[in-house]
Amino acid sequence: MSEKLEANFADTLRVSSFIESINGKIVDDYVIDTDKLGKKTINFEFVNEDGIKIKYSYVIDVVDKEAPLIWLGKSYNVTKGSEDYLLDKIMCGDNYDSNPKCYIEGEYNLDEVGSYKLVFKAEDSSGNKAEKNFTLNVNEPKKGGSNSNTEKVTTDFSQIVKDYKNDDTQIGIDVSKWQGDIDFSKLKASGVEFVIIRVGSSNGLNGENFVDSKFIQNVKNANAVGIPVGIYFYSYASTIDRAISDAKWIVEQIKDYKVDLPIAFDWENWGSFNKFDVSFFGLTNIAKGFMDTIKDAGYDAMLYSSKTYLENIWLPTSYPVWLAHYTKNTNYTGEYSFWQMCSNGRVDGISGDVDINIRYIEK
């Protein structure tokens, strides 16, 4: 056996992970459950060189050694006279602890313009600590509008097709009410190969669900011209039960339409994360609860998120990823099935900006 039988919380480990050598073969090298802290007995069987099956066990200690994450740069700007919501607005989360202790050291006055040198500190229930030095800039309110004459940069759909379309990719878009009335015949003529449509969202944390005002129009028209459809739901779920309920609600909304592509769980409440009382592990399980329910209903599911949050917050799941990373060449090293590459796309059939996506086809 290994000398130190210790497992990090939520790590993927098997029975054999703690065994340096064995006189035989393990019968079932199963994945150990490391979702709870504390001592855990690992029971297993192995067949020795004489063909005799032997029962064995060992004890591991599941521990949390990961410090909280403070989502904060070198400076933070507020307007003079603002209410003191710093501990609400500055994201402070943890892989295990849903409510790490977060506090700010140093003096500041939100009613007085100036720069204040402060330290944001955090400690989780396992005693892991993190801290960040930052400058709080209290600024005078801005007067008047912007005088910028900078020309708006857009991305032409046809150029994306030219640059990224091949035998292994499809080029499409995602839409919601913000795109207004869409001419799907023009989209198809422009080469749009799929569309991911927002089915709806919730009225904030613990709010009621609502159907996107253009959803029915969009899904009917996409079906009518034969553009393959995927779905996304902008979630405010803070519990697994709510995520499951949301998924069942979505299935009811889409049951009369043709949906061939995955249904995406889209959770982006990072600016108000502290109000959700959820750990990163808990948030990942919320997403899994949603996606499991979608899968059980006969649809494919996937997780939507940006590169930064995929790398720092979300834990791995068995579901595909819809990556958001606005760049010509993503350096995201994880696996992904869809890539939302820009939000300033232009295509005939939509009067304003639209997100352009690349789908990677599994052979």
Range-by-range predicted roles:
Residues 1-23, 64-98:
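Solvent-exposed, low-complexity, repeat-rich "mucin-like" stalks and linkers
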Residues 17-58, 97-138:
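Serine/threonine-rich, repeat-prone extracellular segments and beta-strand-based repeat modules
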Residues 229, 300-301, 321:
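Hydrophobic anchor at the start of a short beta-strand
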Residues 247-255, 314-323:
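Short, electropositive alpha-helical surface patch
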